[in-house]
């Protein structure tokens, strides 16, 4: 019986080691992801709404819980933002998504991939907008428009 118990213990420790659950860094992993998520939130919360004099945080378009960070590998992270427009027919939801993307691409200090979505069920055309704000070519084309670029620049400008 003792032999079986020892074999079981060895097998379990081996499985945990192979799965990465017993690595010293594994316990730090959730804390690191939380820290990265807070870092992301700190950057996006001060983005100004294109129509109103408020920030996205003040309007509750973004919150700490709308940011998720996952590790892709040791040097790169997947950042997922799910924002909530103020009304289901918000005509500027695409512009808000563009502002989020531009600010994070410019300011995030770590290597990342970025996915930005409208929170499910919060906008009448969320699928179309999600496609637009995650399409690199459409984002690049939008930023080539001088009028649109100026609006984005005003929204992402850091407050004094």
UniProtKB/Swiss-Prot annotation:
Keywords assigned by UniProt, alphabetized: Chromosome partition, Cytoplasm, Metal-binding, Zinc
Q: Name one Pfam family in it.
A: FeS_assembly_P
What are its GO biological-process terms?
chromosome segregation; protein maturation
Note the subunit structure.
Monomer and homodimer. Component of the CIA complex. Interacts with CIAO1. Interacts with IREB2. Interacts with APAF1.
Q: Specify which residues bind Zn(2+) 2 according to the UniProt entry for this protein.
A: 89, 123, 150, 153
Protein family membership: Belongs to the MIP18 family.
Q: Which InterPro entries match?
A: FSCA_dom_sf (IPR034904), MIP18 (IPR039796), MIP18-like (IPR002744)
Q: Name one GO molecular function term.
A: metal ion binding
Residues the entry annotates as binding Zn(2+) 1: 89, 123, 150, 153
Cellular localisation: Cytoplasm
Q: Does the keyword rRNA processing apply?
A: no
Q: What do the Gene Ontology cellular component annotations say?
A: cytosol; cytosolic [4Fe-4S] assembly targeting complex; nucleoplasm
Q: Which organism is it from?
A: Homo sapiens
Entry keyword Zinc: yes
Which protein, by its recorded name, is this? Answer: Cytosolic iron-sulfur assembly component 2A
Source organism lineage?
A: Eukaryota, Metazoa, Chordata, Craniata, Vertebrata
Q: Gene encoding this chain?
A: CIAO2A
In what tissue types does this protein appear?
Substantially enriched in macrophages.
Q: Which Gene3D superfamilies does the record match to this protein?
A: 6.10.250.1280, Fe-S cluster assembly (FSCA)
Protein purpose = Component of the cytosolic iron-sulfur protein assembly (CIA) complex, a multiprotein complex that mediates the incorporation of iron-sulfur cluster into extramitochondrial Fe/S proteins. As a CIA complex component and in collaboration with CIAO1 specifically matures ACO1 and stabilizes IREB2, connecting cytosolic iron-sulfur protein maturation with cellular iron regulation. May play a role in chromosome segregation through establishment of sister chromatid cohesion. May induce apoptosis in collaboration with APAF1.
